[in-house]
Amino acid sequence: KFSGDNREIKVSAKIMGSWLENKIGNYEGNFSDHSGLGVGSMMSSHELIRFLKNSEWQASAINLMQSFKVKKTQSSTLKSYTNFIKAKTGTLNYVGNMAGYIETKSGRKLLYVILGSNLEKRNRLIKSDRDNPPEAKIWNKKIRSLQLDLIESWALRYN
């Protein structure tokens, strides 16, 4: 249980790692800070799926996620499609990740993890551009559009 105390970043990262290990068992990832967003933080898509599966449909996990609706209005199939899509996103400096849950119209429950990055652009950033990288907004829109296209495709395919 987290106490809310301000702790050193490394101690906080260790607490997060212990918490995750308690949820999914052994893992090969790494937290460099409490948020998991630090440069040294790493986790595989497989480990993220294990976490989602072990937390599956718990209100504590789902309430942290955004709701998404199928948006493609030109398709008659999608116009009448209703489903449950929840996502937790992480987008920063040419890294755009999304993970969450889909419940299809038929009631089938799916888990997904989509990890996307342009590490070449990210690694070329100079320190002064890290808060607002050039072209990052355009890249973020493209990766988000691709992620939502994949989710919508899976929701329909596995209905």
Briefly describe each language-model feature range.
Residues 17, 49-53, 86-89, 100, ...:
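Generic hydrophobic alpha-helical scaffold/packing signal
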